[in-house]
C-alpha cells in the first residue's frame, strides 16, 4: 500500500483567504499589538540602554574604519572606500521620518524589514548592511542595528575628513516590520498617482538644455507644471518606494525648478528648512556616486521577492559582472566631484562652475553634463584607474542653483565653506536623531553638549520635589478650588495625550499646554483651558511661596496631579477609593524653548478620546481613533477601557453629549459599556449622514443616547465588542476602575523617560 497521502496538502497555517480579503475596510487593530515579547528574542528583562552604556564606542568605530577600506570581491568598494555607500545607508534609514505623524526614521532599525528593505530607493543597501554584519556580530547585544546603521554613517563621514556634530545611541531594535506606518496607497513601485490624486501630469520640457542664468527662472512658476502638486499627508516622498524626490525630476521630467518644489515639500515634511536642505544635499553629494551602468531590466527581484538561496539579498544584476563598474542602482550614473572619498566644497564649485545640458545615463535616465565637453577628464572612475570622466549632476542637484531661495543659500555656502561644514554637521545630526525624542534618551560619550531647539528642550529639575504629604495637600486644594472633575481630567489629558510613541515627542513634561501653540488649539478649548490654568497657577504660586529649602511644584506636575485628583474623586463618587500613582519630577519649559511651527504638527486632527474631529476626512473616525491609540502605545483593551472611562468623565470637546452614556457624568462607572451593549435600545444614523447616531428606546421610541462612529465601533466591531463585554458585565466595575487607573497613569507618564 502506498504511504503517500490521498488528500492534497496545498496550504499551511495562516494561508488562505483572510478576513482582510473578505472585508478590506474592517478596522485594523493589529497595529495596537506590535513588537510584543512574542516577537522579541532578547527576552523581557533585556535592558538595551544598560548594554549600550557598557560598549567601547571607540573600539566599534575603529572596527568600522577598518571595514571602510577593506574592499570585498563580492561587492567591491567604489573608489576603494565604502564610506559613501554607508552614508546613503544611514541617510535612507533616517530619511523615512516625517513630521506629520512622527513615524518612520532610524529609531528601530526598520531598514532590515519589508517594505523598506525592498524599496527601489534602497537598492544595494542590502549589501551595505552585510558589509557591517561582522561588526554587529562582534558586539552583539551591546549595539542595536538601529544604532549601528547611524553610527556607521557618522564614521564614514569622519573617515573621509568631515567633522561631525556628534552621535547618540539609544535606538532599540524591533524584530518585525512596523504595520502602522502608512507609506501610500499605490500598488506599483514608484507609483505616485494616489498621493497626488488626479492632478495634471508633468510634461516634458522643450529643448533639454537648462539656461545658465538663474534670474531667468526667478519668476517662473515652472516650465513643466501649471500649479503646485498637493502631496497627501502625512507622506514625505513623491513616489512609492522613494525616500524623498525623484532625482530625475517630478515624475521623471528633468525640470530643476519643479524639482525644487518637490524637494522643499518633502524635506520640509522631514522637519528641514531651506538651509538644512541645501546643506544636506550639498554635503551628502560631496561624496560617492550613483549607479546606472546599464538598463534596469538587468536587475533581478528585490530581497523580499528573491529566492531562498539569495539569503535576504536582492537585485541580482546580470549586466556584466553585476558589481563594481557594472552596478545598477538608481539607473543614474553621476559622480559629483574629483575627490569622492574626501570632504570638499567641490560639489558647489562644479554646480556653479559649469553650464549644464541634459543627457542620459547608460541606463537611459535623465541627468546633466557640462556643456561643450567642459570638465572632461576631471572625475576619476570608481573602479578603473585608466578611465576619467566629466562631472555630472542630477536634476535635483540643479534645483539648488535655479531655485531662487536655494540658489542664494548655495552661493553663500560656495563662498563660505566653513558655513556649509557647520550647517551640514548640524543637519546630519538632526536627520539621524530627529526621531529619538528628548535628551533624556540620548546615550554615549559623543552626545553634543549643546541643546538644540528641535529637541524640545526641558529644563533640568533644580529644586526639591514634593513628597507624599505635599501631594495630599495639593490634591485637597485642587478639589476645593471649584474646578470640576471634567475640567481637571480634560486638562491633564490635553497635556499628556500629545505624546507620540513614534518620535517620542509631546507629553505633559515641559508644561507646554500653557504655551503657544497648544494653548490655542481648538481641541483644547482655549477659553476653558485658560481658566483652569489660572486656577492651577494660583495654587502653584501659593504652595511654592510657602515652602522652605527650595521645594517647588512645577505647573507640568500640577496639571497631571490635578487630573489624578479628578480621577480619584470620580472613583469616589462611584463608591471606590483609589490612589492614582503620581511621580513628580516634570519641569516647565519656556516659550523660547518651544518651536511653535514644530509643535504645530502635534495638534490632533482628531482625538476620539475627546470625541473630537477637526474636519471631515476620507479616513473613518474610528480609524483615526486607532491611529491615535497606536501613537499613545495603547493596546486594544487599554484603548477600550480608557475611552469608556473618559466618556463618563465628560471630557468631550464642547461638552458634547455624544457617547456620554450615563446619567451621572463625572462618576467613574462602567455605564458607557453597559448602556452601549443594552439591547433595549436601537441605534440609527441621524438624518444626513453616517457620522452620528441616536439610540432610541425600542418600546417608546424616545431618544436615550447619541453617539459618534467612535462610540458605536465598540459595540459594532467584533473584537472591540468582546472587550467591551468584559467591562460591561455586572461584576466588572472594580476591574474597570483598576484598569482605567492603570492606563491613565501610563498615558500621564509616557514621556517620563527619566523613570525608566
From Swiss-Prot:
Membrane-spanning residues: none
Family annotation (CDD domains): catalase_peroxidase_1, catalase_peroxidase_2
BP terms from Gene Ontology: cellular response to hydrogen peroxide; hydrogen peroxide catabolic process
The protein's enzyme class: oxidoreductase
Residues in cross-link Tryptophyl-tyrosyl-methioninium (Trp-Tyr) (with M-270): 91-244
Linked residues for Tryptophyl-tyrosyl-methioninium (Tyr-Met) (with W-91): 244-270
EC number(s) recorded for this UniProt protein: 1.11.1.21
Compositional bias segments (type: Basic and acidic residues): 214-223
Swiss-Prot/TrEMBL keywords: Heme, Hydrogen peroxide, Iron, Metal-binding, Oxidoreductase, Peroxidase
Binding locations of heme b: 285
Any single GO CC term annotated in Swiss-Prot or TrEMBL for this entry: cytosol
Superkingdom of source: Bacteria
Site (described: Transition state stabilizer): 88
Function: Bifunctional enzyme with both catalase and broad-spectrum peroxidase activity.
Name of protein: Catalase-peroxidase
Annotated source species: Pseudomonas syringae pv. syringae (strain B728a)
Gene (name only): katG
